[in-house]
Amino acid sequence: MTADSLPGAGGAVGPCVVQYDVTNPGAEPFTYTITFSLMDEQGRAMSNVEETVASVGAGKTVRRTLEHGGYPGGGVLDAGRVRILDVERVPSDEAPAPASSCPASGLRLTADQGDAAMGLRVVGLHLENCGSRTYSLEGYPVLQLLDAEHQPVDGIEILRGTDGIPMAGGDEGPPRPVTLRPGESAVSGLAWRNTTEFGEAVTVPYVRVRAEAGADPVTVAPHLDLGTTGELGVRPWRKDETGAGRGTGDSGSGRPGAQGPYGMPSSS
């Protein structure tokens, strides 16, 4: 990264501009989500900033600018006060659609940031009908677990329902038909336990999700820390009567907020 000070209004020195480069070494376009930590002069983390760089072409490098006028650390923000906490990348044609757009399918599929307590992990999946026609589905999302290189992860049993996941509730019942009119949403979810015993712990950074068999895939980044359990529970689609699933964040990753039909965080 490189940094340059830019003049503010009236010629005053404004907040420093930090520029960063994103290089895609892959053979297809990727969309990157980068989380930056902004620090004060003592190196203490003050705030995090998340930026999405869409559709970086194969073998290409793009330069972007990180501007944070509300920098809380005092003084001038420069590259020495910025750290990269996390980088996620997904194929651009499988990236979650931002709230400002609607895919050709008329369905926007996203994952929220989830919740964790006493070894139990849950991540909500949200399906919004952002199109102009009614959409019906029944059953479970179709999942494919992927490693950091987007290759399939084997050896994990995907359970239909969460009865087999201790403390996950397991009260969702069998699948039933869901009808979504334009503007309505459905919610599903992933549940697992971060238990590590004998054997090698497994972490799954990415999950390719289809709302149902044959639907367009969307790759989300829930970072499943499965430990040595070898199991992941998936809940059936239910209509989101709270309306909380409407309008996810710009990067397509919702934020914990109102409770959905499974008592999990829903995007706001």
Task: Kindly label every feature range from the protein language model.
Residues 21-26, 125-131:
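Asparagine-centered strand-capping/turn motif at beta-strand->loop junctions
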Residues 43-74, 160-195:
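Intrinsically disordered, low-complexity Pro/Gly/Ser/Thr-rich segments with frequent PxxP/GP/PP motifs
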Residues 49-50, 63-65, 69-108, 193-238, ...:
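Terminal connector regions
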Residues 1-63:
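Ordered, small/hydrophobic-rich secondary-structure cores
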Residues 12-19, 117-124, 203:
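Short, solvent-exposed loop/turn segments enriched in Ser/Thr/Gly
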Residues 98-124, 128:
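A structural motif detector for short, solvent-exposed N-terminal "entry" segments of globular domains
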Residues 27-44, 137-153, 157-161:
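Short acidic, flexible loop segments centered on an aromatic residue
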Residues 131-134, 195-197:
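Short beta-strands and strand-coil junctions in structured, solvent-facing domains, enriched
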